[in-house]
């Protein structure tokens, strides 16, 4: 089984291969350091588009399935538009959580 840093680097490489301009942010229990053996790896991917589509989500997420299969870790990516994310018109608990504890990979 791979260690955390190795898996995070593989995730970043996979996303950047698919979208070189994307920003990859780790949040949740792995970012806080209180993950357990059954914790998933929460990833926010910000892309340079006006709006992230379902196709964008698939394009980013599908290559991560190989990493999940090979390592046994569950990866939970959320794809968002950088433009929408940075506008901050609506501050949600999710936004506050990622802003507070998120780590750019």
Where are the predicted features?
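Catalytic core of pol beta-like nucleotidyltransferases
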Residues: 1-23, 31-33, 37, 48-105
């Amino acid at each position: 089984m791979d260690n955390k840093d190795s898996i995070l680097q593989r995730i970043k490489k996979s996303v950047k291969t698919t979208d070189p301009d994307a920003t990859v942010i780790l949040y949740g229990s792995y970012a806080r350091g209180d993950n357990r053996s059954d914790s998933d790896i929460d990833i926010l991917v910000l892309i340079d588009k006006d709006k992230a589509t379902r196709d964008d989500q698939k394009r980013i997420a599908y290559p991560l399935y190989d990493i999940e299969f090979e390592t046994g870790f569950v990866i939970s990516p959320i794809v968002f538009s950088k433009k929408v994310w940075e506008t901050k018109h609506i501050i949600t608990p999710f936004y506050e959580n990622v802003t507070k504890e998120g780590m750019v990979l």
